[in-house]
Amino acid sequence: PGAMLSLALVGAGLAFAPRVPASAVMKLYRGREPDERHAGQLFHIVEALSNRAELPAIPRLYVIPSKTLNAFATGRPDDAAIGVTEGLLRALDVREVAAVVAHEISHIRNRDLIVMAVADVASRFLQFMSLLGVALFILLLPSMFAGTVRIPWVALSVLFASPMLANLMQLYLSRVREYDADLEAAYLTGDPDALASALGKLDRHTGRFWEDLVPTGRRVPFPSVLRSHPKTAKRIARLRELITPDSYPPRRRLPKVALRETPMVTSIGLGPIEMRPRYRLPGLWF
């Protein structure tokens, strides 16, 4: 019965995870849909790139009141939303904003959000089962020392190690998906240099405050196997290889997205920026 209940819970989680409404997730971040009069260029970017990606529906656009530079997507291809922070809109030029939006649209098109949600549910289930195994092991310790119970060490070791292995696989899957989204975004915009430039700005902007708090060893690289995203330098290097027109596959080569000469992306009327980073339920900092 316990195993059946566990499988039922996992099945429910896997079925429910991809169906959380995109608007509900955006409300957690206090995202607001901007007026098209004030963000017409941004709406044009989302619409043009969505059409190029052949999405069944154009994702809804939300602006997040945050100073940090961030963008993310949520939902399914037929019910998706893209959130961009005010900090990102103010720090990047219009080409870079288009590249970042294309990256998020690529995640939507490739159903990365659903894949990662399912992987997250499976990982959390393994963590839960591992905790149960630890609790059972502690309860059986007296009986083990008394010699009345034999502990299945192999099964117990697998149970203990499974959450770590699942997390490593989840991180690897995330890195692969990020590389694919970068390349897809370059094809959608026809402008890989813009995404490379945006990634460089994002990398320079994040982490400096915390690095300055740690005077020694602050430049020690985080182990690549434990990263959810590939190293920015590697992502930029891959994009730089696409800048030469001859490197584009002919069937995927697209003209650049038509943009006005004046890069005007604004979110007037949304109120003051939230200056203080906060921790939100899905686990994202902004």
Regions found by a protein language model. Name each.
Residues G13-A117:
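Peri-catalytic and regulatory segments of divalent metal-dependent proteins
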Residues S23-V25, R175-E178:
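Juxtamembrane/interface segments at transmembrane-helix termini
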Residues D35-I45, R60-R76, G133-F137, E184-L188, ...:
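Alpha-helical membrane-embedding segments
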Residues R111-P142, L195-R208:
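Post-HEXXH active-site segment of zinc metalloproteases
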Residues L141-S174, E184-F286:
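Cytosolic-facing loops and C-terminal tails of multi-pass membrane proteins
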Residues A181:
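Phosphate-/nucleic-acid-contacting segments
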